[in-house]
Amino acid sequence: MSSTAIVHDDDLMEPTLQSIVNQKTLRWIFVGGKGGVGKTTTSCSLAIQLAKARKSVLLISTDPAHNLSDAFGQKFGKEARLVDGFTNLSAMEVDPNGSLQDLLANGEGQGDDPMAGLGVGNMMQDLAFSIPGVDEAMSFAEVLKQVKSLSYEVIVFDTAPTGHTLRFLQFPTVLEKALAKLSQLSSQFGPMLNSILGARGGLPGGQNLDELLQKMESLRETIGEVNTQFKNPDMTTFVCVCIAEFLSLYETERMIQELTSYQIDTHAIVVNQLLFPKQGSDCEQCNARRKMQKKYLEQIEELYEDFNVVRMPLLVEEVRGKEKLEKFSDMLINPYVPPN
């Protein structure tokens, strides 16, 4: 007899992110959308809710703008750091334009870290720079280093604007293919390259080509494992964030189609900055904007009838600091009810 719980459609389509918080198997949660729609506020708020239900949560920004520090009022860097006021929520900001030379630097004193020690000299650096999406590679490399050395129960990504996000998600597949090709070339031309490198003093750090390729193969296996997890809906999901306007809705639809093509699960949309004018309000601009928003909300509900669509109000103040983020995060779980 199966032990799988019976989940009713009403539960799946509730206008909250409660189902994501309750899904204990999730390890990777991406939050993304068009620029300026409230991705960082949403990802921080979701991480706060997850911290109530999980042993350890890591929030990672892969957006070059890095708004996590501003949101929490606390400086974060490329090393995971506990968020003030929490014992199980950490945050870090990965620089997607970080120095590729750091990744390709010599490997002295780096231990068994498969990410380290790719000291390959200028020739290999030029080769690495030719790989498509190399900026996103840096984010991914940094993430893998953290995930391998630290065990977090769930990881939330505050991603870059839409296009960058999708390239970042595609990168594991791209890098897998690139490293597989390098391994193939090594098996064909390895002895010849080793003799050339030997005559020139070898690779930085005293490595030979075989050692380098062993490290790259180890990296490829790690990336392959993570890529498999990304395509598993029990382990990975993507939360789309938008506002009720044409361009944002268009970007969301394009993003959902691409995520589907990458086999990445997405079943939740957060619609931010909604106006709820008081009945009898004589604010023409407010009423006109609300009318426009209602039109696009109806389209969202029609297009994504099998999604959890969360409606979030436009607030009077910026959502910054732990206290305001906690209040905002509560509305991701308990639907906002506008005053009469």
Curated annotation (Swiss-Prot):
RNA-binding keyword on record: no
Pfam families referenced in this protein's UniProt entry, alphabetically: ArsA_ATPase
SUPFAM superfamilies assigned to the protein according to its UniProt record, in alphabetical order: P-loop containing nucleoside triphosphate hydrolases
HAMAP family: Asna1_Get3
Entry EC number(s): 3.6.-.-
Coiled coil feature spans: none
Upper taxonomic lineage: Eukaryota, Fungi, Dikarya, Ascomycota, Pezizomycotina
Signal peptide interval: none
UniProt family annotation: Belongs to the arsA ATPase family.
Binding locations of Zn(2+): 283, 286
Active site (UniProt): 63
NCBIfam families hit by this protein: GET3_arsA_TRC40
The protein's name in its UniProt record: ATPase get3
Any Gene Ontology biological process: tail-anchored membrane protein insertion into ER membrane
Organism: Emericella nidulans (strain FGSC A4 / ATCC 38163 / CBS 112.46 / NRRL 194 / M139) (Aspergillus nidulans)
Compartment annotation: Cytoplasm; Endoplasmic reticulum
Role noted for this protein: ATPase required for the post-translational delivery of tail-anchored (TA) proteins to the endoplasmic reticulum. Recognizes and selectively binds the transmembrane domain of TA proteins in the cytosol. This complex then targets to the endoplasmic reticulum by membrane-bound receptors, where the tail-anchored protein is released for insertion. This process is regulated by ATP binding and hydrolysis. ATP binding drives the homodimer towards the closed dimer state, facilitating recognition of newly synthesized TA membrane proteins. ATP hydrolysis is required for insertion.
Complexes and interactors: Homodimer.
Keyword DNA-binding assigned: no
One GO term describing the cellular component: GET complex
An annotated Gene Ontology molecular function: identical protein binding
